[in-house]
């Protein structure tokens, strides 16, 4: 990528998307496109197609997703599956249709089997049952990975996937009911220290 390449960051307000945005700005990239979910609903194919046709980005970081902790994943199973499948499918296909040079899709560690040997290796994907509580989210993420693979194989697209795991940081969700494990623990430890509590449960 050169400094004037047109770069679209889908999900620029989330933890990973905002980190990518900050890093690119810090490196001197000046042609970065962002849209909030209110400005561009990635679940609607027609609006995504129109956006890509109008903007024609050279590079895409696909960090947009419906995310949440164990409780949210287990309660809103259909929403997590449907919304993530729609976001991924619409962005990946529109990137192909408009000739995006490279797309980076963000997967998740939950794509690996619940009982995968430790430490986990890439080849363990699809070798066992997934954790039930976040299975719909994991299935959607697996579909995104396989979609990138399929578009690369059939159309020669430079679409790749990465699995950022056990992340926390600025713009993360620290809500005790909906956050992932690490931010939840950080919040509990922080509150315990502030309150002088001897232990965390």
Go through each PLM region and give its residues.
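Adenosine-cofactor binding site in Rossmann-like domains, unifying the SAM/SAH pocket
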Residues: 25-50
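Active-site helix of classical SDR
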Residues: 136, 140-143
